[in-house]
UniProtKB/Swiss-Prot annotation:
Pfam families: DHQ_synthase, DHQS_C. It is an enzyme of class 4 (lyase). NAD(+) binds at residues 75-80, 109-113, 133-134, 146, 155, 173-176. GO terms for cellular component: cytoplasm. The keyword Membrane does not apply. PANTHER family: 3-DEHYDROQUINATE SYNTHASE, 3-DEHYDROQUINATE SYNTHASE, CHLOROPLASTIC. Its cofactor is Co(2+); Zn(2+); NAD(+). One of its GO terms (biological process) is amino acid biosynthetic process. It comes from the Bacteria. Its EC number is 4.2.3.4. This is 3-dehydroquinate synthase. Zn(2+) binds at residues 188, 251, 268. Catalyzes the conversion of 3-deoxy-D-arabino-heptulosonate 7-phosphate (DAHP) to dehydroquinate (DHQ). It comes from Legionella pneumophila (strain Corby).
Length: 369
């Protein structure tokens, strides 16, 4: 068995619970690393039909002394639902998993969300470990303890805050990631660049202009920096009462677009990319953001190979109605993360219907601002 090669470690401390984010290579095939965080005799691995043939066998071979059960779910956001969740519960109950069991999430953000939610609720909470295999999950979804399933009315409507025992990011898993999935993860990196600004924003701009790939030497450090940014925010505001809400930049638009298309047109990161551009245009319409910065955001998304316009086939009135179901609404006010400049974002609940409608019209394909 290979030994893992450590690139970086980010320590997270939330509400007295501490855990590491380990960025490495060969982490999935080093039994010593995996078993460091599994003290129980029982383990349930939750994965999907895409990831299982690639990595499940490697992970299982490192757990020979455990009762190791497996749930293999269908792949895709449209399967992040009650039916999949109860498939996990059924396996835990049928295989007589006790309160000291551990759940391992092996996959992308969808698997992490569902396995985490199952862990937070099975027998009022059991241990779980994140092994994210997509770039989006590595830089965003696996960090911070948000878990959820979707409801037909909207995305992530049923969920909890529940922190893992560890997040092990094995960079080797990105080698088998389809290019479209890799690009989708870049959207969350651009989000962090807009939130942080300064040298980090400039670095992301530069690597995207050069062409960021799975083989780029800058990638491990960029992943670590994204994890550090999110960890720092989540440590200060675990339950999204203030600062953490900034991490929703672009997501009010993105979630509505995903729900509108029944999660079948875009990957989550692609919807976020469109949402980031919408947020930039909205900020410009409110007189907050200079047009050259909006153009920079557009260029970053184009360099990343991501969509940024709303297709003209989308009914904007229906899209606006879906936004009214957004779970980030407070006091009946729809809240948006606004951008004054990279590194200066804030929550705004005073966006008028006219301003929002004008923004949506101007980000439709073929329309000019």
């Amino acid at each position: 068995m290979a030994k893992f090669e450590l690139y970086a470690e980010v320590d997270v401390s939330i509400s007295g619970h501490q855990y590491p984010i380990i960025i490495c290579r060969n982490g999935l095939i080093d039994p010593e690393l995996i078993n460091r965080f599994i003290t129980s005799k029982q383990v349930l691995i939750v994965t999907n039909r895409t990831v299982a043939p690639l990595y499940l066998g490697h992970l299982q071979s490192g757990l020979p002394s455990k009762q190791c059960d497996v749930v293999i779910l269908e792949d895709g956001e449209e399967h992040k639902n009650q039916r999949s969740l109860f498939t996990i519960y059924d396996s835990l109950i049928q295989n007589k998993h006790h309160r000291d069991t551990s759940i391992i999430a092996l996959g992308g953000g969808v698997i992490g969300d569902m396995a985490g939610f199952a862990a937070s609720t099975y027998q009022r909470g059991v241990r779980f470990i994140q092994l994210p295999t997509t770039l989006l999950a590595q830089v965003d979804a696996s960090v911070g303890g948000k878990t959820a399933i979707n409801h037909p009315a909207g995305k992530n409507m049923i969920g909890s805050f529940y922190q893992p025992q560890a997040v092990i990011i094995d960079l080797n898993t990105l080698k088998t990631l389809p290019e479209r999935e890799f690009r989708a993860g870049i959207a969350e990196m651009i989000k962090y660049a807009l939130l942080v600004g300064g040298p980090f924003f400039e670095r992301i701009q530069a690597v995207l202009q050069q062409g960021l790939t799975v083989h780029s030497p800058e990638l491990p450090l960029l992943i670590a920096e994204c994890c550090q940014v999110k960890a720092k925010i989540v440590e200060q505001d675990e339950r999204e009462s203030g600062l953490r809400a900034l991490l929703n930049l672009g997501h009010t638009f993105a979630h509505a677009l995903e729900t509108y298309t029944d999660y079948k047109k875009w990957l989550h990161g692609e919807a976020v990319a469109i949402g980031l551009y919408c947020a930039a245009v909205l900020s410009e319409k409110k007189g907050l953001l200079d047009k050259p910065i909006v153009d920079q955001v557009e260029k970053m998304l184009i360099h990343a190979g991501l969509p940024h316009k709303i297709p003209n086939s989308i009914d904007l009135i229906q899209l606006r109605e879906l936004m009214s179901l957004d779970k980030k609404i407070k006091n009946n006010c729809l809240r948006f993360v606004m951008i004054k400049k990279p590194g200066a974002c804030y929550i705004d609940d005073s966006v008028t219907e006219d301003c929002l409608h004008n923004t949506l019209i101007n980000v439709v394909e073929g329309e000019q601002k």
